[in-house]
Structure formats: structure tokens, C-alpha cells
Amino acid sequence: GEKQALTDEQAERLLDTIRGLPPYVFVMIGLYTELRREEILALQWDSVYLEDEVPYLSVRRAWHTEHNRPVILNELKTKAAERNIPLPVCLAKCLREAKEKSTSDYVVANRDGGPLSYTQFKRLWQYIVTRTAKPRVIRKYVDGKYEKHTIYPQLGEKARNNGHCIY
């Protein structure tokens, strides 16, 4: 299936549904920074600079799991993977609020303050998926005939709404 970015309306509906719930910060970061999920789940507050004139976050770590246990890699595969990403106003605001409440080193944490396990991530993801748009079927002209394609809206694709914020 093809990956398709969420439309503005879908993104807005999703954010409304999950505001104040655990997936909210994850989704906000995904929508406004284009970080990969492995990067979001490894993000720690020491890499989020909210007091700077232009707030930004720094990508330095990646999350993966072994036997369902989270493993945080401090060495990214390539130097190019390390980057600083400026935060739009609404995301900086969202992260400030999250940080005030947070008792963890991790921006997206489980109840114990640790990084998510694979099962916890799947649960988070399911939660998001069930509240996002339904898959759409489109007809595509391939080799002289129409074929049906199901499009599942995906987070983390380059969303058109990156430039402006939804509130």
C-alpha cells in the first residue's frame, strides 16, 4: 500500500481526539518535525531546548527493541542522522506543557518513566490508528486497467500542515 500523509482535517481530528492523552506528544512531534518513530521514542529532555530564542530539538539517539525490551542507541548510524530541528510555536508550547508534568528523562515515557517497550509502542500506535481516518480505496490506472489501492493514512509522512499549527 502507498503511504499518504494525513490531511489537515485528519490531523486536526486526531489531535482533538487525543489531546491530553499519552499519544498526544508523540503525534505532535511526528506531525511537526518529521522525526522517525525510533527517534521520537528515544528523545530525552536533555535534547529539547525550549528556552532558546528559537526552540529546537536535537536528534542524537534512536530507540529499538530486543525481545520487547527497549534499547536506546546513543550512537546514530550516520552523522547525517544527527540533526537539530527548529520547533514551530505550537510544538514548543506542547512540549513545555509536557515537560512541566513529566517525571521522566524521556519525552514519550511509559508509566515507570522509561522508554516504551515494543508492546507499549504497538498499543500507542493502535490507539492512534483507530482514531485516525479510515483507509481509503482509490482507483489507479496501471498497465491499461484500473486497480484498487487501499491508502492508509500514515503519521510521520511529510504532512502538508507542517508550516502552520493546528490549535
Specify the residue positions occupied by each region the protein language model found.
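Basic, Lys/Arg- and aromatic-enriched nucleic-acid-binding interface segment
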Residues: 1-43, 51-53, 80-82, 101
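Short, basic (Lys/Arg/His-rich) helix/loop patches that form interaction surfaces
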Residues: 12-23, 33, 85, 100-107, ...
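Active-site proximal loops enriched in glycine and acidic residues that flank catalytic Cys/His/Asp
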Residues: 31, 37, 44-45, 59-61, ...
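A short, basic/aromatic helix-end/turn motif that makes direct DNA contacts
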Residues: 42-48, 157, 167
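Conserved long hydrophobic alpha-helices within structured protein cores
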Residues: 48-64, 123-132
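Detector for glycine-centered tight turns/loop "hinges" at secondary-structure junctions
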Residues: 53, 68-69, 113
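Extended, highly charged linker/hinge segments and catalytic-adjacent loops that couple domains
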Residues: 58-82, 88, 95-96
